[in-house]
């Protein structure tokens, strides 16, 4: 039987170790088993160390970022409180300024009203005095104008006698 016949008659199995390269495969598998773990182990260990280092750095950066975020939140809260305090102080100050302005306005109006009242009183007194003076002058002029018409010589003599008598009694 020739190898060609075996191949044509069914499934053929070649049991010749040297022809099938089983030894070569065994050597390669044994070499991989013996040397590959050391070589790949070093590469994998180096990669594992790098990954762990990167992970540790990332965790540190995360912790720093969280600390920074916490600090920023505290600063924001503090800034909001300061802004609220400033806003409230401004409202109080504005109200105080408004009240002071109203008070000064009322005082100024009272002063102007008082000044106007005193000016009005002074003007009324001046006008009253002027009217009295003019009325007295007018009465004197009228009396002087009527006196010559009403006084005749007998009346003048009686008037003079009466005046002398009054002076003498005093």
Curated annotation (Swiss-Prot):
GO molecular function: proton-transporting ATP synthase activity, rotational mechanism
Subcellular localization, as worded in the UniProt entry: Cellular thylakoid membrane
Gene3D superfamilies hit by this protein: F1F0 ATP synthase subunit B, membrane domain
Keywords, alphabetical: ATP synthesis, CF(0), Hydrogen ion transport, Ion transport, Membrane, Thylakoid, Transmembrane, Transmembrane helix, Transport
InterPro entries, per database record: ATP_synth_B-like_membr_sf, ATP_synth_b/b'su_bac/chlpt, ATP_synth_F0_bsu_bac
SUPFAM superfamilies: F1F0 ATP synthase subunit B, membrane domain
Keyword Transport: yes
Gene Ontology CC annotations of this record: plasma membrane-derived thylakoid membrane; proton-transporting ATP synthase complex
Residue intervals passing through the bilayer: 22-44
Membrane topology type: Single-pass membrane protein
Family in the record: Belongs to the ATPase B chain family.
Role description: F(1)F(0) ATP synthase produces ATP from ADP in the presence of a proton or sodium gradient. F-type ATPases consist of two structural domains, F(1) containing the extramembraneous catalytic core and F(0) containing the membrane proton channel, linked together by a central stalk and a peripheral stalk. During catalysis, ATP synthesis in the catalytic domain of F(1) is coupled via a rotary mechanism of the central stalk subunits to proton translocation. Component of the F(0) channel, it forms part of the peripheral stalk, linking F(1) to F(0).
Subunit structure: F-type ATPases have 2 components, F(1) - the catalytic core - and F(0) - the membrane proton channel. F(1) has five subunits: alpha(3), beta(3), gamma(1), delta(1), epsilon(1). F(0) has four main subunits: a(1), b(1), b'(1) and c(10-14). The alpha and beta chains form an alternating ring which encloses part of the gamma chain. F(1) is attached to F(0) by a central stalk formed by the gamma and epsilon chains, while a peripheral stalk is formed by the delta, b and b' chains.
Protein name as it appears in the record: ATP synthase subunit b
Organism: Prochlorococcus marinus (strain NATL2A)
């Amino acid at each position: 039987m020739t190898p060609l016949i075996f191949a044509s008659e069914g499934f053929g199995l070649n049991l010749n170790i040297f022809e099938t390269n089983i030894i070569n495969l065994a050597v390669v598998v044994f070499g991989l088993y013996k040397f590959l773990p050391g070589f790949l182990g070093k590469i994998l260990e180096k990669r594992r160390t790098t990954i762990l280092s990167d992970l540790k750095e990332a965790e540190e950066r995360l912790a720093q970022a969280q600390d920074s975020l916490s600090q920023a939140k505290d600063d924001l809260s503090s800034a909001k409180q300061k802004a609220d305090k400033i806003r409230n102080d401004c409202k109080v100050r504005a109200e105080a300024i408004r009240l002071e302005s109203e008070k000064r306005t009322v005082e100024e109006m009272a002063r102007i009203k008082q000044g106007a009242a005193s000016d009005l009183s002074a003007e009324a007194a001046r006008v009253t005095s002027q009217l009295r003076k003019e009325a007295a002058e007018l009465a004197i002029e009228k009396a002087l104008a009527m006196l010559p018409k009403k006084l005749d010589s007998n009346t003048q003599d009686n008037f003079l006698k009466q005046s002398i008598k009054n002076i003498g009694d005093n």
